[in-house]
């Protein structure tokens, strides 16, 4: 996979940077693994907006992805690499020896014709799924289960990977992409390797229209709203917000407020909290 840039023959192509889709081999998705999905548009069952700036965009069909990898001991051959409109990662289409077809997240470095398998005693190769207890220390993994049998819930985005740090008793210590070190049960499954399409972080949409194609609507500043719409709104002209610091549309502090519960039961599994992001790395001024 490579990054493609464009000459500035229009304002929209001046800063446009996209992936060239060279790793995608399948033109159409597998029909048996595609279902229709109702587009929520950021609304709940009563039609109330619960997630702002969502709606519109190109039509999509949901690909059924196998996050459980529960066909233990049955080898599968990678038949194609497909595009998924619902995620940045690519999908690998697997043809199992018993005739079943499934999608999995395509790991970096996987190739057409490669054989993958899941189980408790499988080779240490990219794309194979196995319990964390069977994975060597220092290995990179993705699609990690939080609870055995529930399917991969962590480390699923493009270019992400977690590192196996230590094993002690019934738990395995994982260093997550956020730099947090967390304990996970040793019987939980994970897939070897990192998720492919890591170059997606270097892309740029280039224009507002491409963002609308993805189903993202414009974000309006609170200071230009009315007082009934945002705490920052109102006033004559470009008025200050009138508060000691910026707040959310619901009046809560917007910068630096911790949202995790202090007494959350899973806190005991977090050995080291994630590293805080500095102002310089966020793009702000360094005091």
From Swiss-Prot:
This is Large ribosomal subunit protein uL2. One of its GO terms (cellular component) is large ribosomal subunit. Belongs to the universal ribosomal protein uL2 family. GO terms for biological process: translation. SUPFAM superfamilies: Nucleic acid-binding proteins, Translation proteins SH3-like domain. Keywords: Ribonucleoprotein, Ribosomal protein, RNA-binding, rRNA-binding. The lineage of its organism: Bacteria, Bacillati, Cyanobacteriota, Cyanophyceae, Synechococcales. Gene3D superfamilies: 2.30.30.30, Nucleic acid-binding proteins, Ribosomal protein L2, domain 3.
């Amino acid at each position: 996979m490579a990054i493609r840039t464009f000459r500035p023959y229009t304002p929209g192509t001046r800063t446009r940077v996209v992936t060239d889709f060279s790793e995608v081999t399948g033109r159409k998705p597998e029909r048996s693994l595609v279902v229709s999905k109702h587009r929520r548009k950021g609304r709940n069952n009563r039609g109330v907006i619960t997630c702002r700036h969502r709606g519109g965009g190109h039509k999509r069909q949901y690909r059924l992805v196998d996050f459980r990898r529960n066909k233990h001991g049955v080898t599968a051959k990678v038949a194609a690499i497909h595009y998924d409109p619902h995620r940045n990662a690519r999908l690998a289409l697997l043809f199992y020896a018993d005739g079943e077809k499934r999608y999995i997240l395509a790991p970096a470095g996987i190739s057409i014709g490669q054989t993958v398998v899941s189980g408790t005693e499988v080779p240490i190769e990219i794309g194979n799924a196995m319990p964390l207890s069977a994975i060597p220390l220092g290995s990179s993994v993705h699609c990690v289960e939080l609870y055995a049998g529930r399917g991969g819930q962590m480390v699923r985005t493009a270019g992400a990977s977690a590192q196996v740090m230590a094993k002690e008793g019934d738990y395995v210590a994982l260093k997550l992409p956020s730099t947090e070190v967390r304990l996970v049960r040793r019987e939980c499954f994970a897939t070897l390797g990192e998720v492919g399409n890591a170059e997606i972080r270097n892309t740029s949409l280039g224009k507002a229209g491409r963002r609308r194609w993805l189903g993202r609507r414009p974000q309006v500043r609170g200071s230009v709203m009315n007082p009934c719409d945002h705490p920052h709104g109102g006033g004559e002209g470009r008025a200050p917000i009138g508060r000691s610091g910026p707040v959310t549309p619901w009046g809560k502090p917007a910068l630096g407020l911790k949202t995790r519960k202090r007494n959350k039961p899973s806190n005991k599994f977090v050995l080291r909290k994630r590293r805080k992001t500095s102002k310089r790395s966020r793009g702000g001024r360094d005091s």
